[in-house]
């Protein structure tokens, strides 16, 4: 169920200049980066790109969701890492993205880790936003 404006706890604001070949910065100055297309897409690869920024945001958000689920389940995920791989390619509408999420949870058996990751995928705001729109594989 979508949230309403009155439900918002925090709003991030970022402004891009010159799209994929420019810069992007947040209004608070916490992020100010050069953006360039990767070499695979004809760019010089000298800066970051939207796919890297999306992967960074998704992995951090998913890690937070994993922590919430782990606390509810009484599991210790303090040494866990989450990696998001975001690919971009052509589709019938122009371009689309695909995501792979993997988590390493030391000290937790494989079945429990898998269950935690699947539960995190249900509550992660990025997962909710992408559900039904792009392919997201849990590895």
Region spans (language model):
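Extended beta-strand/beta-hairpin segments
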Residues: 1-56, 63-139
């Amino acid at each position: 169920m979508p949230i309403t404006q009155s439900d918002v706890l925090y709003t991030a604001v970022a402004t891009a200049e010159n799209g994929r070949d420019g810069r992007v910065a947040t209004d608070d100055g916490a992020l100010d980066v050069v953006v360039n297309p990767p070499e695979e897409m004809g760019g010089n690869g000298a800066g970051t790109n939207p796919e890297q920024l999306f992967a960074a945001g998704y992995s951090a958000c998913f890690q937070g969701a994993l922590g919430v689920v782990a606390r509810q389940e009484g599991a210790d995920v303090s040494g866990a890492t989450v990696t998001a791989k975001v690919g971009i390619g052509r589709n019938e509408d122009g371009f689309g993205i695909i995501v792979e999420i993997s988590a390493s949870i030391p000290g937790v058996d494989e079945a429990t880790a898998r269950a935690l990751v699947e539960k995190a995928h249900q509550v992660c705001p990025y997962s909710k936003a992408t559900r039904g729109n792009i392919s997201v594989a849990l590895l």
